[in-house]
Amino acid sequence: MARVKRGNVARKRRNKILRLARGFRGSNGTLFRTANQRVMKALCNAYRDRRRRKRDFRRLWIARINAAARMNGVSYSRLIGGLKKADVRINRKMLAQMAVVDPASFANVVNATQG
């Protein structure tokens, strides 16, 4: 069998990792072994946080809606229950945006749920 020299393949593999590690601090961006560990950790964190971001934004929206609802004299749970009962289909993202940008229309939505 012919001898396989891995110069190009190995260099490409290492350079791919080092490209991903560009901007990392200290040896984490220059030495292959530490860069490889940091890149694997970074990719794990990115995967986890793409899922966590959805939860975090939902929590933020709920906190904003709750604050605005309480300013209008109703709790978050009563507001959401009233919206479901009144068959008002506005999602939490839109409600939170409305509460921040246009409090008057948010107050109208709150009044619609209490009627």
Curated annotation (Swiss-Prot):
InterPro entries, per database record: Ribosomal_bL20, RIBOSOMAL_L20_CS, Ribosomal_protein_bL20_C
One example GO MF annotation: rRNA binding
Listed GO biological process terms: ribosomal large subunit assembly; translation
Name of a matching Pfam family: Ribosomal_L20
Keyword tRNA-binding: no
UniProt GO cellular component terms: ribonucleoprotein complex; ribosome
CDD domains: Ribosomal_L20
Keywords on record: Ribonucleoprotein, Ribosomal protein, RNA-binding, rRNA-binding
Record NCBIfam families: rplT_bact (TIGR01032)
Family: Belongs to the bacterial ribosomal protein bL20 family.
Function: Binds directly to 23S ribosomal RNA and is necessary for the in vitro assembly process of the 50S ribosomal subunit. It is not involved in the protein synthesizing functions of that subunit.
Protein name as it appears in the record: Large ribosomal subunit protein bL20
